Amino acid sequence: MPVRKQDTQRALHLLEEYRSKLSQTEDRQLRSSIERVINIFQSNLFQALIDIQEFYEVTLLDNPKCIDRSKQSEPIQPVNTWEISSLPSTTVTSETLPSSLSPSVEKYRYQDEDTPPQEHISPQITNEVIGPELVHVSEKNLSEIENVHGFVSHSHISPIKPTEAVPPSSPTVPVIPVLPVPAENTVILPTIPQANPPPVLVNTDSLETSTYVNGTDADYEYEEITLERGNSGLGFSIAGGTDNPHIGDDSSIFITKIIAGGAAAQDGRLRVNDCILRVNEVDVRDVTHSKAVEALKEAGSIVRLYVKRRKPVSEKIMEIKLIKGPKGLGFSIAGGVGNQHIPGDNSIYVTKIIEGGAAHKDGKLQIGDKLLAVNSVCLEEVTHEEAVTALKNTSDFVYLKVAKPTSMYMNDGYAPPDITNSSSQPVDNHVSPSSYLGHTPASPARYSPVSKAMLGDDEITREPRKVVLHRGSTGLGFNIVGGEDGEGIFISFILAGGPADLSGELRKGDRIISVNSVDLRTASHEQAAAALKNAGQAVTIVAQYRPEEYSRFEAKIHDLREQMMNSSISSGSGSLRTSQKRSLYVRALFDYDKTKDSGLPSQGLNFKFGDILHVINASDDEWWQARQVTPDGESDEVGVIPSKRRVEKKERARLKTVKFNSKTRGDKGQSFNDKRKKNLFSRKFPFYKNKDQSEQETSDADQHITSNASDSESSYRGQEEYVLSYEPVNQQEVNYTRPVIILGPMKDRINDDLISEFPDKFGSCVPHTTRPKRDYEVDGRDYHFVTSREQMEKDIQEHKFIEAGQYNNHLYGTSVQSVREVAEKGKHCILDVSGNAIKRLQIAQLYPISIFIKPKSMENIMEMNKRLTEEQARKTFERAMKLEQEFTEHFTAIVQGDTLEDIYNQVKQIIEEQSGPYIWVPAKEKL
């Protein structure tokens, strides 16, 4: 049945009549659905498609109306002629019209047949004035347009190029020829004169590509997210912009980190890799990074984000039965814990199907498939070695559980595999010699959306190739080795998420031939590093994949490292690149897990906050060799740890972020660390802390909120953040019992329990006061009563007190001498003081055992103290976090536990281990 515009209008009229009758509450959902359908009927795009359909059926398919080809060049009659110059026009971007025609995009509707459309503007996308449209439609024969919905779902609307529009001076347009349509670049389709709609320019020969990498609008979903700015800002980090694209040449603004506990995390809708289109009314497409940051900073307390994200790729789980042949299972794998094939994904992936093997003959397993299990052995969250072992230890009949991507699209970042033989280690028990079989194209049925980064070794050309990288805030995102005796410079590590990783063009084992035309074939390591460092923002690298050379080089380096370690243990000498070594003892000020450090050059060494490490070789800028020092002596195990420089560099990169909080009050030029020093050293009377000063200190943490971020992100911190790494220490013998300072939630109960359980080991000191003695009090037992206020103030100025305060116009304080008296009696003096007292005791040569109780969460605090309300627990948790931030380097140890008993037992153990007589104290030397 032919489509008529009158039929569309009648359907619209009937829908509107039916909608008006839906007045009951229970009809609300149905009414909303009908309104969406009405909006589609009234949209300008829908009207244009009806015009095309009607013209196609009424004019082109009607033989009497066919026009003689010989008259194609003649002007048509006025009824089919438009004056192009008089037509207003606008562009419709691909972002404004996703294929779903959802209400989140702009709606264009006619008020009646003869008037231009009115503006119906959604703030999500654009503020352009809407008029008659000039739109591109992707290449499609008109004969394929058999229904409107099918046409819409296969069309891509994109901005029209000015050079492709018909010049305004053209008085007429050529006649439309009879089907099939010749290959003219642009044709203009008139409609019947009764409707008189605006013209639609249909480009049948070209398609404007999307401004976004890897995918068209059909691959994305859109969402509006409203966030309320909290004390820590919006709680996410961004990267990208026209001046520093985050992924390839895509200038979009991407979400790179969601901060735990922040506004975005609490809302739960925003995701990493979401692309921000608008912030409130500000369009942040195709803007610089700083413009996007400014838009977020100036957005106010309620922030509306309009984002788009790639639709998730669904997976189909299936079981495949393979029968081993002479070539084994006949496929290769990559991935696993500690050896991720795709950044952020520990899964095991199929990277190669070997021709003639069991998998190839079966035909079901494809490159890009994810292996979930082999027989009854789970392959999720396992190492690469464990997966290989599981596959090799199978019988002749093997059952594979695999996850197959079911997405139908293939985009720029994906490619169908070429079936070639494997030069990498296949997963089978019979590895045949590698031989080149040529590039045999796979059948379409075997195409799968597998990333180019997932292809095997022999898909990588062995010829020199040119790669262009754009430097991120922390560099190019790869490590190099080599440069000795002209052996070449090789890439040894690709940083996940860095520029090199995101480009997908470099890999471990590449030899760097040149950097920005600087020949590095015979360069030393230092020369190569300098060339890369000074290469500027855009770096052109010529690289050649040489895995065999790199493997030989890596084996040699490993042998040298082993020799270095052995000689270091036996004689204390020997180094890879330096003959002189530094040896020192340090206290770790952070936890280190070697399994999470992918850049380790050799066997790593785990440690926790407060551990003492004997660094036996600190000659290298990036890595040190060390042994752990225990109460029983030094461990025999020698391992590699990150150097102070490396720790601080990585932590500063992690802390780089955009602060989306509002403008700070006062002292904007003064860093948090400056204030810490001022609070710690500059106050002559620390007890004189008025209300304003206290409020200012409380707000400091709020004004310097940071969040985790990735490489290519900006920092709006005023000054460089102080990073804790290692503290140099010396061993010292003490002839006193060390004081004990416990900080954090539940400290009072821990203190009381220690004195109650071990009254012979723990005690408290007698404080000083200028308050008059009461009748029942004894001087020296209850207080040391000071008759002269001036004298006590003088003693405070001379640092004879570790802490003092004022109450009811009387001074109270704890003197160094009072603490010393308890210590010399062989008891641990339990001190209820602030973190500032730790440093003052150290200056007085009374090194305390300072233990911080770090709560795991608000709920953890409420579980241990059930009398607290949620608000009290929240404030306690915040105070603890601020305490940790301010005094971490002065803590002897940090403890955490689920119960009070657990924490108490840890505290007792730490005090026992740290009691002496040999203790580690801060050294004066600098690292």
From Swiss-Prot:
Residues 4-64 form the L27 domain. Coiled coil: none annotated. Residues 683-858 form the Guanylate kinase-like domain. SMART domains: GuKc, L27, MAGUK_N_PEST, PDZ, SH3. Residues 704-717 have a biased composition (Polar residues). Phosphorylated by MAPK12. Phosphorylation of Ser-232 regulates association with GRIN2A. Residues 581-651 form the SH3 domain. Residues 224-546 are annotated as: Required for interaction with MARCHF2. The modification Phosphoserine is found at S122, S138, S158, S232, S568, S573, S575, S579, S598, S619, S707, S710, S857. CDD domains: GMPK, PDZ1_Dlg1-2-4-like, PDZ2_Dlg1-2-4-like, PDZ3_Dlg1-2-4-like, SH3_DLG1. Residues 691-719 are annotated as: Disordered. The modification Phosphothreonine is found at T115. Essential multidomain scaffolding protein required for normal development. Recruits channels, receptors and signaling molecules to discrete plasma membrane domains in polarized cells. Promotes epithelial cell layer barrier function via maintaining cell-cell adhesion. May also play a role in adherens junction assembly, signal transduction, cell proliferation, synaptogenesis and lymphocyte activation. Regulates the excitability of cardiac myocytes by modulating the functional expression of Kv4 channels. Functional regulator of Kv1.5 channel. Belongs to the MAGUK family. This is Disks large homolog 1. The gene is DLG1.
